[in-house]
Design a protein with these regions (language model features):
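Active-site neighborhood of divalent metal-dependent phosphoester/pyrophosphate hydrolases
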Residues: 109-111, 147-148
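A generic secondary-structure signal
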Residues: 79, 129-133, 167
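Charge-dense, low-complexity intrinsically disordered segments
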Residues: 67, 117, 155
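Extracytoplasmic/secreted cell-surface and envelope-processing proteins
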Residues: 98-99, 119, 152-154
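Active-site groove signature of glycoside hydrolases
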Residues: 127-157
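Short, acidic/turn-prone active-site loops that include or flank metal/cofactor-
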Residues: 114-120
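A short, flexible beta-alpha/helix-coil linker loop
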Residues: 57-62, 117, 148-151
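Secreted/periplasmic carbohydrate-active enzymes, especially glycoside hydrolases
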Residues: 1-92, 97-102, 106-110, 125-126, ...
Length: 179
């Protein structure tokens, strides 16, 4: 199983053939684990209670801005693990695939946050692409649909989030959401 201490990963290879010839091939890395949230008892990973000790990670780094090299992504997760962290939130922006790859390899749970709270076609398309891209990452345990949005906490915002949650549930019913 994939865990914080032993982040076991596997690779599935999918090949598409036509007339007996390989026409396409793709490889997907994944981990196997169970996740449960209990209102009274907290977070459980593989049936064991885990206290999430995390940080909010912004997509920027001194000297390189938002274009963080893969090695620095991994270095940041390694340092967080060394500090005793086991979780992080990708603040205000979706994470890069390389960031999630590092979290998968190093055993760090992630709250994967979308860029904006929106039920317009563009916003829902962005959310769909995010979920489809990131749903095989065992590190991702929560989808964050909104943060510091002007519509949070009012009737219009509730309608927007309801639409977003319906799409999230259709694409990935295995994870919880937060707004």
């Amino acid at each position: 199983l994939w865990s914080l201490e032993e982040p076991n990963l596997y690779r599935a290879v999918t090949a598409l053939e036509a007339d007996g010839k390989a026409v396409d091939r793709d490889s997907t890395t994944f981990g196997i684990r169970t996740v449960r949230f209990d209102a009274d008892k907290g977070f459980f990973l593989n049936g064991k209670p885990v206290k999430i000790k995390g940080t909010c990670n912004h997509q920027d780094h001194a000297g390189v801005g938002a274009a963080i090299p893969d090695r620095i992504q991994a270095y940041r997760i390694e340092r967080l693990k060394w500090m005793g962290c086991n979780g992080c939130r990708t603040s205000h922006n979706p994470p890069t695939p390389e960031f999630l790859d590092a979290c998968d390899r190093l055993g760090m749970v992630v709250m994967d946050e979308t860029r904006m709270m929106s039920s317009c076609p563009e916003g829902l398309s962005e959310l769909e692409r995010l979920i489809k891209r990131d749903r095989n990452h065992p590190s991702v345990v929560i989808w964050s649909l909104a943060n510091e949005e002007p519509e949070q906490g009012n009737t219009r915002g509730a309608r927007i989030v309801s639409t977003m949650k319906k799409l999230q549930r259709k694409l990935d019913p295995s994870r919880v959401v937060t707004t």
